[in-house]
Amino acid sequence: MARKNQKAPWEPEEEIIWVSKTEMKTDMDALQKLGEELVDLKPSVLDKFPLSEDLAQAIKDAQRFKNEAKRRQLQYIGKVMRSVDPEPIQAALDKIRNKHSQATVELHKLEQLRDRVVAEGDAAISDVMEMYPEADRQRLRQLARQANKEKAANKPAKSSREIFQILKELKLGD
């Protein structure tokens, strides 16, 4: 009799992906650390996250607990997170982090623009007028002159701060 190409009943039909115990522990630790970051967030921010009811309640409980109870609760959060897809949660957390870093970058750009207005005067003010046509050219010139006088007299940089506030308001108005 000819033997057909049949698999023996003990041979699996699909390929099994083998994962080491160390890799599994590393993944679990990563989920627990993600849970810790969620516990550190304010409740108003947490409401915006795509969390299951169990996970949301576990996080709220962990925020109340202290010391050893909190450590155990964090382990429980890690366990609950194994049954949840962590990618949407991680994406929302990254979005919040990037929002803060992006705001910091914008403020640094405004500070550099303010420094240019004080140092270069009319040339930098013209650039500001191109970016923000609703800006008050006369007020910016006046503040730039005052800032230079304050700098020469070693006085506090009140006018520079005011220029920064004007630029910030113009930026927020966009």
Swiss-Prot record:
Molecular function terms from GO: ribosome binding; rRNA binding
This protein's GO CC annotations: cytosol
Name the record gives this protein: Dual-action ribosomal maturation protein DarP
Originating organism: Vibrio atlanticus (strain LGP32) (Vibrio splendidus (strain Mel32))
Pfam families assigned to the protein according to its UniProt record, in alphabetical order: DarP (PF04751)
Keyword Magnesium annotated: no
Transmembrane segments: none
Keyword Mitochondrion in annotation: no
Family: Belongs to the DarP family.
Task performed by this protein: Member of a network of 50S ribosomal subunit biogenesis factors which assembles along the 30S-50S interface, preventing incorrect 23S rRNA structures from forming. Promotes peptidyl transferase center (PTC) maturation.
Gene3D superfamilies, sorted: PSPTO4464-like domains
